[in-house]
Each structure stands twice: as C-alpha cells, then as structure tokens.
Amino acid sequence: MSLSLLLRGAVRCNAANLVKSARITPLKSYSTLVANVQRKAVVQPLAVAKIVAPVVREISVSAPRMASAGSSHTLLWTVERIVSAGLLAVIPAAFIAPSQVLDALMAISVVIHTHWGVEAMVVDYMRPSVVGNVLPKVAHIALIIISVATLGGLFYFIQNDVGLANGIKRFWAIKGKDAEKA
C-alpha cells in the first residue's frame, strides 16, 4: 500500500508529467526537463527508502514453520484420495447387495470423507489471525463431536433398523400425494 501511495505521489509531483500534459513548452525543452527529472530520480529512492522503511513489512521467501511442520502430510493426503476413490465402489456395492458390513463401510467412508472436507474448511477459514485463538479450537472440537455423533447415529440405524442402504431405498420409494392420484 505504501508503494502505491509513493508511486501515486511521484506521478502527481513529477514536473515532466505536468509539462507533458500542459504542452506549454516546446518539445526540445520537454526533453531537457525529462532528462533532469531522471537524473534526480536516481538519487531520490535512497531518501524515500529511509522514510518508507518503517512502514514496509518484511517479506520472507520461505514458508513459515508451523506447529505441524515436523510431520509429513503426504500419507494423510494419500489416505484421503484412497477413501474418495473407495466411495465410488462402496456406495454402489451397498445398494446392490445390502448388508451390515457394507452399510458400516459406507457409513465410515462417508463420515470420514465429510469430516476431512469440513475440517479443511475450518482450518482455511477459521484462522487464528482472522477470528482469534478460541473460535478455531471451538469449531474443530464441534466438528469432531458432530462427526462422532453422526457415525454413532448411522451405526445405531444400521444395527437396530433396516440398514443404511435399505433405509435410503425406502426413502426414495416414498410417493407423494400427487403420485397417488395419477
């Protein structure tokens, strides 16, 4: 921001730009003015740098070391991709041949896939620098509680009712009032 203010000020205060826009002097005088301004510009950045330096932030080329920087996330990324690809096989298999094992596998896969997706959003959008130190921790704990409760509820439904795939099939089979009249 300070650089843009500096550049705007340089454009406004530049005598050559004023002369160029007004065209009140002949072209030969204009070129002399431009040359004089360019000679002064070589010395000017040193003086400006001393004034602007306290306002400018330090820029680092390397990434900052975070608390989790000691571990590699490659394994987690690989597992996330395997679970995502596995969903392509587990969901149809659970509907083709419904069983408690496939229902449980589908419940675990869907809940963990959703948990990782929402966790990525919490980490990205609930940064401590934006919302403070407490809210990211509360959001992450709430996400864990919701994920565990969802998985527990799905297991309860699988064990004590018709199962997940059959329950979804029954839900799809519900006909509305308009369908009965036709």
From Swiss-Prot:
InterPro entries: CybS, SQR/QFR_C/D
Pathway this chain belongs to: Carbohydrate metabolism; tricarboxylic acid cycle
GO molecular function: heme binding; metal ion binding; protein-membrane adaptor activity; ubiquinone binding
Topology Mitochondrial matrix: residue spans: 1-71, 123-135
Annotated localization: Mitochondrion inner membrane
Binding, a ubiquinone: 125
Pfam families according to UniProt: CybS
Disulfides per UniProt: none
Entry keywords, A to Z: Electron transport, Heme, Iron, Membrane, Metal-binding, Mitochondrion, Mitochondrion inner membrane, Transit peptide, Transmembrane, Transmembrane helix, Transport, Tricarboxylic acid cycle
Binding site for heme: 113
Swiss-Prot/TrEMBL GO biological process terms: mitochondrial electron transport, succinate to ubiquinone; tricarboxylic acid cycle
Membrane topology annotation: Multi-pass membrane protein
TM region positions: 72-96, 102-122, 136-157
Topological region Mitochondrial intermembrane: 97-101, 158-182
Gene3D superfamilies per the UniProt record, alphabetical: Fumarate reductase/succinate dehydrogenase, transmembrane subunit
GO CC terms: mitochondrial inner membrane; respiratory chain complex II (succinate dehydrogenase)
Membership in a protein family: Belongs to the CybS family.
Role summary: Membrane-anchoring subunit of succinate dehydrogenase (SDH) that is involved in complex II of the mitochondrial electron transport chain and is responsible for transferring electrons from succinate to ubiquinone (coenzyme Q).
Complexes and interactors: Forms part of complex II containing four subunits: a flavoprotein (FP), an iron-sulfur protein (IP) and a cytochrome b composed of a large and a small subunit.
Name assigned to this protein: Succinate dehydrogenase [ubiquinone] cytochrome b small subunit, mitochondrial
